Amino acid sequence: MFGAVRISLHVQCIWSFKRTLDKSDHLYWSAYSGWYSTTDEAFYSDWEVDTSPLGAVSKTSGNQVHWVEEETFRFRLSAFKPKLHVWLDSGVLPNESPEHAGLLALTHKTLDRLEDPCVSRPSSRVPWGIPVPGRIDQTIYVWFDALMNYLTAGGVSFTADGNSQALWPPDIHFVGKDILCFHAILWPAILMALDLPLPKKIIPHGHILVGGTKMSKSLGNVLSPADVLGDLSRALSVSPVHGEVDAESVASDCLRYCLVRSVCLNEDTTFSLPFAKETVNTELVNWLGNLLSRITSKKIAPNQTAPMLDLAEAQQFLSAPADAKFFNDLSQLPFVFDDFWWDRLLPNRSVDAVMHVVRQTNAFVDRHKPWAAGGDGDAQAVVGVALEALRLVGCCLSPLTPYLSNRLLNCLGLHPGKLRGHSWRLDLTHQPLIPRLNV
């Protein structure tokens, strides 16, 4: 969510939120002292500061800090600590992986240590901020200002027109793990003070590393998405056999796919262009693309048609022991995918399940060799099951790779308005799903 902090609506909402907190005695005027980082625009407590050859630095960012004493408005965070501890343990934060469990424990510990934070700064040092109503010597502290963007952009206000909550609260709030303190402590405390609903779930994600280091403008190791998309587009080895290919759409699908495969929702992960190319060539070109090409070939499906069998019907023809697990995994794929994607919020695990079925389908085809069966019932059943697997794969991957998924379904004679029928009628163009990326 992006918002310009100087727009009139946001300024008016900030003032109204501040007045509401004043009336409920959640703000007070007080002296404040602490370690301040100009680079981070944040105060740090003693336990958050370390010494270095450069002097005092933030343990979190490594940026220099200096001691500051000033008078400001402060927020009574201490009044909400008991409620916040209960809320944090209510399941709002994930607790399945060791990384997430560690973040939850750290958030509880941080909450215990935090003092009442400042919500304003002297305008002599921060003249560019939104002024505090009635106090020309104070400006709204940037962290309070930034968090309020969620409410103003979501249509929440405390103006004379009333309190509209059209887009509040969010079902899921994705935040970087380094700003979890703001979003899992300060932000819900403010919402409690304003008597507004809290986010239903907060998902802290890891960082995308470059060369093992978090991306930073100061380090000069930032990867621009536009540059990566350009590199991927230029690496596509498109030939006439691929037909009309939208290189930009293919590159976008590949980048999204690789980012989700990087598991960055659970932990830090290193991203590189060679990794992306290897992932695409292995999983989308070799595993998925080659499966589509051979199962729709005229050697295996000479009439370019096949019956749409359900798995119970297919089992009448196919009884190899390995088929039972494959049929079970295939029938459960939509449910497993949805569980990981929507309920457990682990999209990388969703894609794991899809690629597992792709590999199983390749093994299933190799095991039954429909090209050598002479077009009998067994061969037709193999083709029908493999095509059904491809259909489910295309549907599951559509949120992640919409262009390639649509291309795959078109090859099966399907489209968004028709995802199932009585029989398969394949696309006769036989275009490969995706061009290989030049490494």
Segments and roles (model prediction):
Residues 8-12, 135-140, 176-179, 246-250, ...:
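Secondary-structure capping and boundary motifs in well-ordered enzyme cores
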Residues 11, 32, 57-302, 354:
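Structured secondary-structure scaffolds
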Residues 12-19, 146-149, 287-297, 360, ...:
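Alpha-helical scaffold segments in carbohydrate-active enzymes
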Residues 30-35, 56, 339, 345, ...:
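Basic, alpha-helical terminal appendages of large translation-related enzymes
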Residues 94-96, 336-351:
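Short helix-to-loop capping/linker segments positioned immediately adjacent to catalytic or ligand/cofactor-binding
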Residues 268-273, 331-340:
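Short, charged/polar, low-complexity loop and linker segments
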